[in-house]
Amino acid sequence: MAIIDSFVGSSKISARDLNVHYGEKQALFDVNLDIPVGQVTALIGPSGCGKSTFLRCINRMNDLVEIARVSGSLFLDGIDIQDAAMDVVQLRARVGMVFQRPNPFPKSIYENVAFGPRLHGLAAGADELDEIVISSLDKAGLWGEVKDRMGETGTSLSGGQQQRLCIARAIAVAPEVILMDEPCSALDPIATAAVEELIDELRGSYTIVIVTHSMQQAARVSQRTGFFHLGKLIEMGETESMFTSPQHPLTQGYITGRFG
């Protein structure tokens, strides 16, 4: 039985008896959790523990894996996203994702950010599209660095700038949730600090769920933390409490470095 504390406020995302199989291998076992609106929730645990699998359930990226099978319920604002009637394109507009390695499109910086709003019809004309692009880059802390380089390719930027461009691209379609799967693992310490500062600035405007192998990063950026082990949610609670007084022996062992 997972140890999960309660929190004040409403849930943006709720999982109930969520199970995931890849072929014959079960990756998640009866996961039950709630993710509060407008906060940063970190998911930690050893490699292969299921945290990224859970993250991919939130925007149904597992639909793209032929052998994946998902059962149970996963709610976004009370609506089960596993329902066959769910519009997955609209879901992924509401739930943006930033991947482990920066993956800018082979297009200009401008087009990287403009692509999503144009696809979803979010801009009435060129002027409004410009406003969305500039606002998104500004929110991602990148506008000042690229405002004179908008015609250059996204791949011409540094690794840290590319990752912030990907965050701007996610922001541009006005998501409610931003998923981040190890967003700093390929970045140097300076670029990592910039992304972490950005996450803190985005908190409140978005519900953010971040998977990280770095417990130090989880402690710095999140308000709540969930610990996964062998496909099971072991413990979830306020980040400060999790790191100072974990309640489950497995959580304590992982945090103190006895395994992982």
Curated annotation (Swiss-Prot):
Origin organism lineage: Bacteria, Pseudomonadati, Pseudomonadota, Alphaproteobacteria, Rhodospirillales
Compartments it resides in: Cell inner membrane
Taxonomic source organism: Paramagnetospirillum magneticum (strain ATCC 700264 / AMB-1) (Magnetospirillum magneticum)
Family: Belongs to the ABC transporter superfamily. Phosphate importer (TC 3.A.1.7) family.
GO CC terms, sorted: plasma membrane
Pfam families: ABC_tran
Coiled-coil blocks: none
Primary location: membrane
Domain ABC transporter as annotated: residue spans: 13-255
Protein name: Phosphate import ATP-binding protein PstB 1
Family matches, as CDD domains: ABC_PstB_phosphate_transporter
Function: Part of the ABC transporter complex PstSACB involved in phosphate import. Responsible for energy coupling to the transport system.
Annotated binding of ATP, by residue: G45, P46, S47, G48, C49, G50, K51, S52
